[in-house]
């Protein structure tokens, strides 16, 4: 089963079992909804702890969550600095608009030019500012940085496992 990070518990809040969560998901409303299942990965623990969201509210830049069966600060203190994740079963395709993809769908795809030249595999995605940048590992060469703009990324074909790109002058 694959897990995907949606947030980090940074501290407790009050004495009634609430935790402060910094969201790292684009969909906090659905990921942290009451009744949602989250998996807390603690440092030095091999298996995650399964948690069900009992309440959620936004406070400043945090989400304050409480979990079923964890009514006091003593119950949740152990989760400080835990990473909250969801399984691939919780990822919903209707969260995405046409032309949007989850990072894990893009990483590992082959980058191929419109002329059919294989450039390498996409190894990571950077988010430095206005546009994401897809990093292509090229054998025997330095990494190629592709901005996620329509002029460069022409088509994503998940079934074929490739991304069709048109290199602008200066990218190679």
Swiss-Prot record:
One of its GO terms (cellular component) is ribosome. One of its GO terms (molecular function) is ribosome binding. Binds ribosomal protein uS19. It comes from Levilactobacillus brevis (strain ATCC 367 / BCRC 12310 / CIP 105137 / JCM 1170 / LMG 11437 / NCIMB 947 / NCTC 947) (Lactobacillus brevis). Residues 98-171 form the PRC barrel domain. It is found in: Cytoplasm. GO terms for biological process: ribosomal small subunit biogenesis; rRNA processing. An accessory protein needed during the final step in the assembly of 30S ribosomal subunit, possibly for assembly of the head region. Essential for efficient processing of 16S rRNA. May be needed both before and after RbfA during the maturation of 16S rRNA. It has affinity for free ribosomal 30S subunits but not for 70S ribosomes. Keywords: Chaperone, Cytoplasm, Ribosome biogenesis, rRNA processing. PANTHER family: RIBOSOME MATURATION FACTOR RIMM. The gene is rimM. Belongs to the RimM family. This is Ribosome maturation factor RimM. The PRC barrel domain binds ribosomal protein uS19.
